[in-house]
Regions:
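Conserved alpha-helical segments that form or flank metal/cofactor-binding pockets of metalloenzymes
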Residues: 2-4, 63-117, 188-195
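A contiguous, mid-protein "functional segment" used to position or interact
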Residues: 172-239
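Acidic/His metal-coordination segments adjacent to aromatic residues that form catalytic metal sites
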Residues: 13-31, 94-147, 214-228
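Conserved small/polar residues in nucleotide/adenosyl-binding loops
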Residues: 295-300
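C-terminal accessory extensions/subdomains outside the catalytic/core fold
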Residues: 211-294
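Inter-helical turn/loop segments and adjacent helix faces that build the functional surface
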Residues: 48-54, 160-174, 195-198
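Alpha-helical bundle segments that constitute or directly flank the non-heme di-iron/ferroxidase center
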Residues: 18-51, 64, 68-72, 137-165
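Alpha-helical scaffold segments in carbohydrate-active enzymes
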Residues: 58-79, 150-153, 157, 173-194, ...
Length: 306
């Protein structure tokens, strides 16, 4: 269950209105690596973690914190849009020529048209947030590695936003978010370290016997480009304790493919006698229909009568 507190987790008050900054913050709220992604990814991972209370609590605590970050960003965006030039936005809605669009000066029109001068779950270009951004695989190590990437990308974008604004209030909030994302990176890295020690560095563990190939495939870096800079890995130790090898000539062990061509009619190649094209197409369609009939399940009524 969740209990809502009326106070924000941290300050979220700009010095003055600025719809351009509001648009930039949308990336941190509803972009691919934003707080919405963090909140829902960690929460779903936590719900799906059964039998490991340590990591379950870690994920759910962090996911709940991210919800507070979403609230802070939505609050900040609302304040930044206060006194936004709605008359200019209305003109843009009626006239899509480039000159009118330029008047907008970088503001996100969806803030007015869709959200009524409020925040939305979309990125800085108005693309809607998608559940495709999150990962919850059931494999803790794989998920924790995704979480490290998510926090790294999020902190990268927050720091860039920080450097592109002079508003002290916005900077104060962004500085706080960077600090928390530092903690989250470190905690997920620690979780990865613990899980690797227990299960090994390769996901999923326990599948080595499924690999028929030897180390010429599992621990060899192939050179697929000009230059030999990657040769520096030769002899280095991988995280599983084995040595890396370098091959300047990639192995070609599969042979040349031997495929059967599709019927000419399917490749848009007309038959030798064009007059037979219609009849040939009809035969193909009838064959498809007959095939479909073979796999059609009986209706409940037919099943009952039989």
């Amino acid at each position: 269950m969740y209990i809502r507190k009326s106070k924000l987790q941290y300050h979220a008050k700009p010095e003055k209105s600025n719809p351009i900054i509001a648009r930039r913050l949308q990336e941190i709220l509803g972009g691919q690596w934003g707080e919405t992604t963090g909140m829902l990814a960690y929460t779903l991972q936590g719900w799906n973690t059964v039998g490991n209370e340590k990591y379950k609590d870690l994920l759910l605590d962090t996911g709940t914190e991210e919800m507070g970050h979403m609230e802070m960003l939505a609050t900040m965006i609302n304040d930044l849009l206060h006194d936004a030039p709605t008359d200019t936005i209305e003109k843009l809605a009626r006239n899509s020529d480039p000159a009118t669009a330029a008047i907008l000066g970088g503001m996100d029109p969806q803030h007015a048209f869709v959200n009524g001068l409020g925040a939305g779950l979309s990125d800085s270009n108005g693309n809607p947030w998608s559940a495709n951004f999150i990962i919850s695989s059931g494999n803790l190590l794989a998920d924790m590695r995704f979480n490290v990437v998510r926090e790294s990308q999020a902190r990268l974008q927050v720091s860039r936003n920080f450097l592109q604004t002079e508003d002290k209030g916005v900077r104060d909030m962004l500085s706080y978010l960077m600090a928390r994302e530092t903690q989250h990176q470190l905690q997920f890295l620690k979780a990865c370290e613990e899980l690797e020690e227990k299960y090994g560095p390769v996901v999923p563990h326990g599948t080595q016997d499924l690999q028929k190939q030897g180390k010429e495939f599992t621990h060899t870096l192939y050179n697929f480009s000009e230059g030999e800079a990657a040769q520096a890995l030769e002899g280095e130790t991988a995280r599983d304790g084995n040595k890396f090898h370098y091959s300047s000539d990639p192995i070609m062990a599969g042979g040349e493919p031997d495929l059967t061509a599709a019927p000419e009619i399917l490749r848009n190649t007309p038959p030798e006698d064009p007059s037979t094209a219609v009849e040939e197409g009809r035969r193909m369609l009838e064959g498809e229909q007959n095939t479909c009939l073979l796999y059609t399940s009986p209706s409940p009524r037919d099943a009952h009568e039989s």
